[in-house]
């Protein structure tokens, strides 16, 4: 059997080969200067889409706010695998809230930052709240609708993975009808 070397080709901006490109051709993800809000070492499942989605979403929010961001995270899979006591994988100011009240906690943080900004104590610090589909559409919908009704200055991210993943993959109200979750 003969040996034939295979040439490596760049297949996208997020592949390992990105570091082999000239610096001006590299993507943001290959740049050492980029924000990394969620570090490696968390306990998410291998290939976890929520970990990757959270990292990209929060990194984008960090970029948009010049790294002036505070996050409120509802109890759920993301919180469980990223912050086992006493450790955390988050590299931003981050607070854990109850299962359905991340929007309420974020509203309080945003109100406090507004007062501190008016007093000249802080700059333009923005607030992000995040939770899974169960904590958002089932348990936390009252807090979320109140936040939207008041037009609070909070970015809310719902990670809809089709069910309550850290408690046995039960369906949530965001799970499509007749979908199999387990």
Question: PLM ranges: what are they?
Answer:
Residues 5-159, 163-180:
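Cofactor-binding active-site loop characterized by glycine-rich and histidine/acidic residues
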């Amino acid at each position: 059997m003969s040996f034939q070397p295979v040439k490596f080709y760049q297949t996208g901006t997020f592949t390992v080969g990105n570091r082999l490109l000239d610096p001006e051709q590299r993507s943001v993800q290959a740049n050492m200067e980029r924000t990394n809000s969620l570090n490696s070492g968390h306990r998410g499942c291998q290939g976890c889409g929520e970990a990757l989605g959270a990292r990209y979403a929060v990194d984008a929010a960090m970029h948009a706010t010049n790294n002036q961001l505070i996050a409120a995270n509802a109890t759920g899979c993301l919180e469980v695998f990223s912050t086992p006591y006493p450790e955390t994988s988050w590299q931003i100011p981050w607070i854990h809230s109850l299962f359905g009240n991340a929007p309420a906690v974020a509203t309080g943080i945003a109100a406090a930052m507004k007062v501190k900004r008016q007093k000249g104590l802080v700059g333009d610090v923005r607030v992000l709240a995040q939770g899974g589909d169960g904590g958002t559409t089932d348990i936390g919908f009252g807090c979320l609708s109140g936040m939207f009704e008041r037009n609070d200055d909070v970015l809310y991210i719902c990670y809809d993975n089709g069910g309550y993943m850290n408690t046995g993959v039960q369906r949530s109200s965001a799970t499509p009808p007749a979908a199999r979750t387990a």
